[in-house]
Amino acid sequence: MQKVIKWLAVTALALSIGVPVWAEQTFVTIGTGGVTGVYYPTGGAICRLVNKKRKEHGIRCSTESTGGSVYNINTIRAGELDMGVAQSDWQYHSYRGTSKFKDQGPFKGLRAIFSVHPEPVTILARRDSGVRHISDLKGKRLNIGNPGSGTRATWEVIEEAMGWARSDLKLAAELRSAET
């Protein structure tokens, strides 16, 4: 009997040495934007860096193409995304519970990890369009951005500040950044 126990102990030890210890993997998903925009490759670059060392730290990263900043923030808040790329102004509004996030209240659990690049509002018009001031946009064709994007949310702030309705534009296109 003692021989059998000794043999089982040696066999168990040999098997445990030969089998790697499997660390529990943690999966992280980063919400980005449209696949042709800037946010998607940004998320992809982050995931490539994380995944290079995944055997060491046990974290596996993937990206998800989304509607953009506002969508990402709302989805993080709902617990459906781990991280997301977002314009800093919309992160600020979400954290404070202002503007588009007023009804939801402050999202104090939201944190910034780093800044990718500044995103100022830029309005371009042809020289012969007659647009010299923001008020000259009324009655014009304009890309207001896709729903869920920071571009769209920023346009809605401008629209409200100007006292306009969507019908005040000749055409309100909902194009993604890469389509403009």
Model-assigned labels for residue ranges:
Residues 19-23:
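Sec/Tat signal peptide C-region and signal peptidase I cleavage site
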Residues 1-9:
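Bacterial N-terminal signal peptides that target proteins for export
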Residues 102-116:
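A structural signal for short loop-to-beta-strand junctions that line the ligand-binding cleft
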Residues 8-18:
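Bacterial N-terminal signal peptides
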Residues 25, 29-31, 35-38, 48-71, ...:
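N-terminal secretory/targeting leader peptides
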Residues 47-48, 62-103, 179-180:
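Pocket-flanking alpha-helical
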Residues 12, 80, 141:
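Conserved functional loop/turn residues at catalytic and ligand-binding sites
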Residues 27-52, 115, 119-179:
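Bilobed "Venus flytrap"/periplasmic-binding protein-like clamshell domains
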